Amino acid sequence: MTYHPKSDFLRVMQERGYLADCTDMQALDEAMSKGVVPAYIGYDATAASLHVGHLLNIMMLRWLQKTGHKPITLMGGGTTKVGDPSFRSEERPLLTPEKIDANIAGMKQVFARYLDYSDGATGALMLNNAEWLDSLNYLDFLRDIGRHFSVNRMLSFESVKSRLDREQSLSFLEFNYMILQAYDFLELFRRYGCRLQMGGSDQWGNIVNGIDLTRRVLEGEIFGLTSPLLTTSDGRKMGKSAGGAVWLSGEMLAPYDFWQFWRNTTDADVGRFLKLYTELPVEECDRLGALQGAEINGAKIRLANEVTTLLHGREAAEAAEATARAVFEQGGVGGALEVVEIAPATLGEGLSVTHFLVAAGLVTSGKEAKRLVAENGLRFNNEPVSDANAPVTAAMIGDELKVSIGRKKHKLVRLA
């Protein structure tokens, strides 16, 4: 029998499709109905920005704040030095402290678009677990914390078991990650009264570890809530495109390309993505998602505009839509297309189309460039390119050259 929560937050989670599992739905619902519940999600600083795969959990934090609770974004300045083994096929490379700090700075810019970090009962907090992990005494930690963990139980977690079943190495360093993440929850409860940890369903084992530890050490009533691991209707992992990660940083991915990612959503995913990634009413999401034929394209544009507005602002969303119309409907050039610069010295007397595409970073290899040309997938200023060895010169580029790769990827190349 489905439980129907009375608290606004859990009702939104259930209605919009954010909810996979909860350790004690009724008790959490009761707590959230009575007052402000601080809740956190942890983010290891393994990249210079977050990507679309993180966006579902960021939206959960946004809804948490909108429904009267306190979101905590926990930066893994400490745990990133160890690495999360969850469902990894191999050990992560270790990062320097300087690189970790730089990554955290990039991630902060993204969170500030979605959460209000001002003072107040529901003002968001941004914390770094290096605050308590960097100063730990190892022997004290083993005695006071390590004794509460069963290695047998930790080996049964699917994230660990899958590595061992493939006979792949799981280092002691990574194995300790689970204990450190559990300790985060204990410290957040002790220092900030945090009572809820959220995350993707692959984090269930880590979340339960933290709950068990906090109950044993501090006898705290705390909870865990997970979201589904999202894939598209055709089975692709959310957050990836043919060109790689879909970054949430405007410096790593142009707002136009971000907008275009959402515009290219598969028909079957439109309604679901509107519920998860926008704040439109559920009824409107259902109506738009049910459209068919040519009408579904309007729903995709609405999705792209709403998601891009949340991250980059209304002006960027409108510019992206205008550029898309110019590029696709009129065959022109829009102002929001990403600009790629190439030095005249690189071109010399002229580069072949193949070498030009690689030098400009438009493809990853000469083989890919030749395949594009062979499959009629390359156009310069809307004209098909049929010879992969034809020269590209500075004079040919002129003020700018519009390069179209396939039907959906367009760049402007200018001389540096």
UniProtKB/Swiss-Prot annotation:
Residues 351-416 form the S4 RNA-binding domain. It catalyses: tRNA(Tyr) + L-tyrosine + ATP = L-tyrosyl-tRNA(Tyr) + AMP + diphosphate + H(+). The gene is tyrS. Its EC number is 6.1.1.1. Keywords: Aminoacyl-tRNA synthetase, ATP-binding, Cytoplasm, Ligase, Nucleotide-binding, Protein biosynthesis, RNA-binding. It comes from Cereibacter sphaeroides (strain ATCC 17025 / ATH 2.4.3) (Rhodobacter sphaeroides). NCBIfam families: tyrS. GO terms for biological process: tyrosyl-tRNA aminoacylation. One of its GO terms (molecular function) is RNA binding. This is Tyrosine--tRNA ligase. GO terms for cellular component: cytosol. Pfam families: tRNA-synt_1b. A motif ('KMSKS' region) lies at residues 237-241. It is found in: Cytoplasm. Catalyzes the attachment of tyrosine to tRNA(Tyr) in a two-step reaction: tyrosine is first activated by ATP to form Tyr-AMP and then transferred to the acceptor end of tRNA(Tyr). ATP binds at residue 240.
